[in-house]
C-alpha cells in the first residue's frame, strides 16, 4: 500500500490473508515502513497487488505510476482510488479533472475497470489494472 499513513489498508489486506506492507514518508511500524512513493524501496516484480489512494498527494504522478508498475509482478493487479473533478484535501498537490489523465500514465498495464465508486473520504473513482509486461 503506497502512502499508507497509519496502515488501515494494510490491515484490511492482512485480514483477507493477503501478505502486505505499507510505505509512507511518515512510518507507522509494523504496518507501515518508511518509503517514498516516487522511489518505492522494493525490488522489481515484488508484489501481486499494488494499492494506493493518494495519487492527489503525489508531486509526480507519472513517477508514482512508473514505480507502481515496476514493483508489481507480471499479471499482478494495480488498484488506484482517486478523487476526480473535485478539489483535493489539504495535503493534495495534484488535482485530477478526468480519470483518463491517470489512466494514460500506465504503459505496461491493461485497464480492467475504471469506474465511479461510492464516495469515501473524497475518493470517487476506482481504476483497476493488470500488469501485462515489464
What are these regions (language model features)?
Residues 85, 89-117:
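Conserved Class I S-adenosyl-L-methionine
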Residues 48-61:
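A short SAM/SAH-binding and catalytic strip from SAM-dependent methyltransferases
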Residues 109-134:
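Core SAM-dependent methyltransferase catalytic element
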Residues 59, 73, 107:
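Short conserved AdoMet
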Residues 75-85:
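Conserved beta-strand signature within the Rossmann-like core of class I S-adenosyl-L-methionine
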Residues 38-50:
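A short acidic, Gly/Pro-enriched loop at the edge of an enzyme's catalytic core
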Residues 62-77:
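A short glycine-rich, Lys/Arg-flanked "PGG" loop and its adjoining helix->strand segment in the class I
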Residues 1-39:
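Class I SAM-dependent methyltransferase SAM/SAH-binding core
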Amino acid at each position: 500500500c503506497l502512502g499508507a499513513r497509519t496502515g488501515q489498508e494494510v490491515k484490511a489486506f492482512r485480514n483477507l490473508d493477503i501478505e502486505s506492507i505499507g510505505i509512507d514518508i511518515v512510518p507507522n511500524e509494523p504496518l507501515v515502513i518508511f518509503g517514498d512513493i516516487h522511489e518505492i524501496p522494493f525490488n522489481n516484480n515484488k508484489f501481486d497487488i499494488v494499492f494506493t489512494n493518494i495519487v492527489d498527494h503525489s508531486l509526480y504522478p507519472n513517477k508514482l505510476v512508473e514505480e507502481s508498475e515496476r514493483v508489481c509482478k507480471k499479471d499482478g493487479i494495480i488498484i488506484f482510488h482517486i478523487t476526480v473533478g473535485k478539489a483535493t484535501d489539504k495535503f493534495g498537490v495534484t488535482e485530477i479533472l478526468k480519470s483518463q489523465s491517470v489512466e494514460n500514465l500506465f504503459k505496461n498495464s491493461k485497464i480492467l475497470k475504471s469506474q465511479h465508486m461510492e464516495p469515501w473520504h473524497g475518493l470517487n473513482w476506482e481504476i483497476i489494472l493488470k500488469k501485462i509486461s515489464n
